[in-house]
Amino acid sequence: MALPELQTLRYELHDGIATITLHRPDKLNAFTTRMGGELIAAFDHTDADDAVRAVIVTGAGRAFCAGADLSGGGQTFDYAARPQAAQQETRVGEVYRDGGGRVTLRIYRSLKPVIGAINGAAVGIGMTLQLPMDMRLASTEARFGFVFARRGITPEAASSWFLPRLVGMQTALEWCFTGRVFAAQEALERGLVRSLHAPDELLPA
């Protein structure tokens, strides 16, 4: 299965390890509809490629993913006005899912182990995107945040199912209710990430 042309990601395969890099460094890798579609296509590709034994997901530059790209202002979530509107309404099973939910459930269904290498800021969908991954490692400079309450919206991308199963209900509710941004050390102590690494040692780990 050929991988389509990628505009928001970079894809590399070396020694059986596929590395998918969120690649909008000038926008802190902010998530877009196109990025979501490309991530789904990339995971379709890794599942179909027998040369891939595992997948790493990371970000370019100083962020993993700083959340959704809100540069469209009030039109950001006006899906009906977009040519990709049909994609946003795609069912996953019997349920209509938001764009982030389609991506996280695709990652969850991956046939290959998925490792998140969280290299920097991970807030909003940058936080929820990593939850279905099998393992998460983080840079000591990474920061995390479920900031949805501060925006007056509910956590998306099926995170209300994934998060309590990783860190427990009490921690999940605290993070969601407060919307605060926290350091990598807390992510380690609460069980969100497996280990912390110096920035230049994260991918080799």
Where are these regions (language model features)?
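Conserved CoA-thioester-binding segment of acyl-CoA-metabolizing enzymes
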Residues: 1-60, 76
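Charged catalytic carboxylate motif
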Residues: 34-38, 99, 106, 205
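Histidine-centered beta-alpha loop that forms part of the nucleotide-sugar donor binding/catalytic region
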Residues: 23, 68, 119
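Hydrophobic/aromatic residues within transmembrane alpha-helices
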Residues: 20, 57, 69, 129-131, ...
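Phosphate-coordinating loops and pocket residues in cytosolic domains that bind phosphorylated ligands
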Residues: 30-33, 66, 75, 150, ...
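Glycine- (often His-adjacent) and acidic-residue-rich active-site loop
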Residues: 59-106, 122, 152
